[in-house]
């Protein structure tokens, strides 16, 4: 599933081609996504795009009278293409733009979403979200406060959007390795220093992934069709049995809350 770096990479890739341009019309080839594509998106016509923003794993296209909310789901990606490029099997939604280009949404598993809302505030998919991990609001002190009485393993707690948004399975594993913290540790057992290290590790790992265009393991592509190159820098995720890049110990794998987790037994305590 695309996580924060992949969604932010998509935002940065499409923004220069959309802001200041007008949506001439939408083409919805298959509206049966996680939720049906909103009727207002089917009917789009002559709508300028004012901004392209991101909240958590949602892309937000601001129009004069409302917002398009896009979620990439498990296998979605967005590309900027020439208008004349023929659609392929899994290309479900196009926004045809005034500059001769299309914003094309591709999603083999159809678990993404295209929603419409007049107002962002209070929309059910955006309500009750924690802070952005790259914001000043997310820091060691905040993490310590939220972990202090939490009797759950730190790995699944990091993936809870009420704690912090956008940190999915890949980046939770990578951040815990960078901070030297075992994924089985109870959140409440983390010291003030460990919380500070973990907050900084999360920021550093996410920023590095954004620099590399995100992580492509299967379906994700950047807006120009290229894969994300952070996959080449993964320290533990997907490397079961391979030697740790730091100490040489074989990487271990297990499950936490039904999600695959990877760690080094020597580097993470």
UniProtKB/Swiss-Prot annotation:
Its EC number is 3.2.2.23, 4.2.99.18. It comes from the Bacteria. Binds 1 zinc ion per subunit. InterPro entries: DNA_glyclase/AP_lyase_DNA-bd, Formamido-pyr_DNA_Glyclase, FPG_cat, MutM-like_N-ter, Ribosomal_uS13-like_H2TH, Znf_DNA_glyclase/AP_lyase, Znf_FPG/IleRS. The active site is at residues 2-3, 57, 259. A zinc finger (FPG-type) spans 235-269. DNA binds at residues 90, 109, 150. Its cofactor is Zn(2+). One of its GO terms (biological process) is base-excision repair. It catalyses: Hydrolysis of DNA containing ring-opened 7-methylguanine residues, releasing 2,6-diamino-4-hydroxy-5-(N-methyl)formamidopyrimidine; 2'-deoxyribonucleotide-(2'-deoxyribose 5'-phosphate)-2'-deoxyribonucleotide-DNA = a 3'-end 2'-deoxyribonucleotide-(2,3-dehydro-2,3-deoxyribose 5'-phosphate)-DNA + a 5'-end 5'-phospho-2'-deoxyribonucleoside-DNA + H(+). GO terms for molecular function: 8-oxo-7,8-dihydroguanine DNA N-glycosylase activity; class I DNA-(apurinic or apyrimidinic site) endonuclease activity; damaged DNA binding; zinc ion binding. Keywords: DNA damage, DNA repair, DNA-binding, Glycosidase, Hydrolase, Lyase, Metal-binding, Multifunctional enzyme, Zinc, Zinc-finger. Involved in base excision repair of DNA damaged by oxidation or by mutagenic agents. Acts as a DNA glycosylase that recognizes and removes damaged bases. Has a preference for oxidized purines, such as 7,8-dihydro-8-oxoguanine (8-oxoG). Has AP (apurinic/apyrimidinic) lyase activity and introduces nicks in the DNA strand. Cleaves the DNA backbone by beta-delta elimination to generate a single-strand break at the site of the removed base with both 3'- and 5'-phosphates. Monomer. Belongs to the FPG family. This is Formamidopyrimidine-DNA glycosylase. The gene is mutM.
């Amino acid at each position: 599933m695309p996580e924060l770096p992949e969604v932010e990479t998509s935002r940065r890739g499409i923004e220069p081609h959309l802001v200041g341009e007008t949506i001439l019309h939408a083409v919805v080839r298959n509206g049966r996504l996680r939720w049906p594509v909103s009727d207002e998106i089917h009917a789009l016509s002559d709508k300028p795009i004012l901004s392209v923003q991101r909240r958590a794993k949602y892309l937000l296209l601001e129009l004069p009278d409302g917002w398009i909310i896009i979620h990439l789901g498990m296998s979605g990606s967005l590309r900027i293409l020439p208008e004349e490029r023929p659609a392929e099997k899994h290309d479900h939604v196009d926004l045809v733009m005034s500059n001769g280009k299309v914003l094309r949404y591709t999603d083999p598993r159809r678990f993404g979403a295209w929603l419409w809302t007049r107002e962002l505030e209070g929309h059910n998919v955006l309500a009750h979200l924690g802070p952005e991990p790259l914001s000043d609001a997310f820091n060691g002190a905040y993490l310590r406060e939220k972990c202090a009485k939490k009797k759950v393993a730190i790995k699944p707690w990091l993936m809870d959007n009420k704690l912090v948004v956008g940190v999915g399975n890949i980046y939770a594993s990578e951040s815990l390795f960078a901070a030297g913290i075992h994924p089985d540790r109870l959140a409440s057992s983390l010291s003030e220093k460990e919380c500070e290290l973990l907050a900084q590790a999360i920021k550093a790992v996410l920023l590095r992934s954004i620099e590399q265009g995100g992580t492509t393991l299967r379906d994700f592509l950047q807006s120009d069709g290229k894969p994300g190159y952070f996959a080449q820098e993964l320290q533990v995720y997907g490397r079961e049995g391979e030697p740790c890049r730091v100490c040489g110990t074989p990487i271990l794998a297990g499950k936490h809350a039904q999600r695959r987790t990877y760690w080094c037994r020597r580097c993470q305590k």
